[in-house]
Amino acid sequence: MKNPMMTTLLAGGLVACASQPTPPTESATMPSTRDASSTVAVEAATANPLLGLSTLPYHYPPFDRFRNEHFMPAFEIGMAEGRAEIERIAANPAAPTFDNTIVAMERSGQTLGRVSAVFFNLTSAHTNDELDRIDADVSPKLSAYNDAIVLDARLFGRVRALYEQRATLGLDAESQRLLERYYVNFIRAGAQLSDADKDKLKAYNEQLAKLTTQFQQNVLKETNDSAVVVDTRAELDGLDDSAIAAAAAAAKAKGLDGKFILKLQNTSGQPALAVLKNRALRERLYKASIERGNRGNDADNKPVVAAIVQVRADRARLLGYPSHAAYQLEDTTAKTTAAVNKLLGQLAAPAVGNARREAADMQKIIDAQRGGFKLAAWDWAYYAEAVRKQRYDLDESEIKPYFELRSVLENGVFYAAHELYGLSFSERTDLPKYHPDIRTFEVFHDGKALGIFIFDPFKRDSKRGGAWMNSYVDQSALFGYKPVVANHLNITKPADGQPVLLTSDEVQTTFHEFGHALHGLFSNVRYPLFSGTSVPRDFVEYPSQANEMWATWPKVLANYAKHYQTGEPMPLALVAKIQAAEKFNQGFATTEYLSASLLDQVWHQLSPEQARVSDVAAFEQRALANAGVDYAPVPPRYRTTYFSHTFSGGYSAGYYSYIWSEVLVADTDNWFKENGGLKRENGDWYRERLLSRGGSVEAMQLYRDFRGRDPIIEPLLERRGLTPAASR
């Protein structure tokens, strides 16, 4: 399990589509200390399954034994143990050594790390009201726990002394990097501040821990409460029978027999918008989506956003940075706001230009059908499908019967991993589950046990939106741990007896998230700090996006894209259509993404004075206009009030990471094609030089070790249809 304190120092939050949920790190103020020897703690220690290392294979969590009442006592005991361990290190009368200081800190906090891994993963994947209350209570306490460590002058003095003599310590490369990371992370966490400023920092961190927790809980509540109730089946014309049955089941579960409920996904756009023929219902669904957190109710996120932005800006200045974005980006591969602004600005104008051309094509169809209206945001997905049908003779309903979930996973995702890396998978039905829908697999590399993979595919009210990977057990040679990782999706579960048929986007997401899982499974490092996805935010999305290329690789596609009823492979003519349409609608896709990325940057590049925003909605509109991406038919992928990535998910000033990583991905795609594609020797090269090394080597050096040079941007421009030749 990753040491939660050092996870904080390295990453500072949840990776929304990537790695382990970690204790909130934007918090502080010391909680009242409860001694682990108290009556409650002693009783909990004798019966609490969170307090001991799991005896299941790979230390897999005993989900069937966990109860809500176990968590708070386990957190209290874990923090008490961790404080005692850190106190022994800080007060050690012996001169600091790498082992008695740095390695000792890596070994500390095991109980707390174990509790945190389970708890924060469950609050994302399968929460309830009691877990939410515990989350709100424990988040500021954990932040205070972290602050007490990183702001301890004695501890930092030992780290600094070692850092200053690092050239004489005879450390190997990974140990040298570990020492350097500890030193830098302590400084970034405020270790060099005065005592008075440390107190201010703790107060800021405590505020942020509470605010970011509140933001995410509001998003989940609003997403559930904003689901659209439909009175008649006729209004759902265009949805397939499986989707209609799922909508009926959702309504029945809410006591609305005879009606239908369209649940919302986390993005502004909703899948049903592509097929619903009823324009009024499309408008209702779209507006329900984009007004989340903006309805003036008790879950309105506008005041929460304003407070988060202000406190982050104030904290950045206290730490010596002009803005929160400047602080965050210093520890990434981008390094500066100027570099990020340059990339986003370089892409914005051509992306919007492509989107306008795409809109013109759709308007022609509307006019030809005598629609009598101008294309609106709720029309885009529907008429994009019409254009795709017209231009490529292709529509989603023709594709979905070939994308059955089990086949996509086992004959697609797992097959590609076998061909590239020699992986094999054995389902473990004997291991406990936190929800009946999950599947658990033991993973083998050339027949040798590698780790555990948990697959949690379906949307439910207890699960946050989106898709992500997390870790329950991080690989570490220091502890002898093998990884236990999980992928979470939000696929709508069909009615009983109906097949689970995926959209093209859902297939891509399944491959994407498994790219993160591979990053965790292949980790081969000594220290927990460097395990798996413990890399900069703008690098962590690289392995996941790179894995997407195999979804449409001919040999892989032929192995999994088979009709769910007949078993017949997807016809070659249909495959050719899919390949021909790969760049279709890229103007929209790039613009909606860039709009959200630019919003994230504008919010977080504010100085403390500029951050005093009174009207969140007006600020958002001005920001989009100033960036040249305020094109009404293409809303941001996330509007501010439900932008969990940046206001609660660890991607603050970091949502640009997807397009930044895609520069590497497009270049990597070319490398595989140049070297024969889906071959074991290619997979081994990529695994050994990049996937297995986690954060133990500087991120761009890993890329150079793999590719032999720095990345170039031209493949991305071609891939996104942003060059003249590729724009149509």
Model-derived segments and spans:
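Bacterial N-terminal signal peptides that target proteins for export
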Residues: 1-6
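C-terminal motif of bacterial Sec signal peptides marking the signal peptidase cleavage site
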Residues: 15-16
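N-terminal helix-rich structural modules
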Residues: 26-241, 672, 728
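C-terminal, non-catalytic "cap/extension" segments appended to globular domains
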Residues: 32-67, 77, 237, 246, ...
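Short His/Asp/Glu-rich catalytic/ion-coordination signatures at enzyme active sites or charged loops
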Residues: 55-70, 119-138, 161-203, 263-303, ...
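Intrinsically disordered or highly flexible coil/loop and linker segments, enriched in small
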Residues: 80, 84, 88-95, 111-128, ...
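Active-site-proximal, well-structured secondary-structure segments within enzyme catalytic domains
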Residues: 174, 178, 210, 217, ...
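Short pre-active-site segment immediately N-terminal to the catalytic Zn-binding motif
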Residues: 492-511
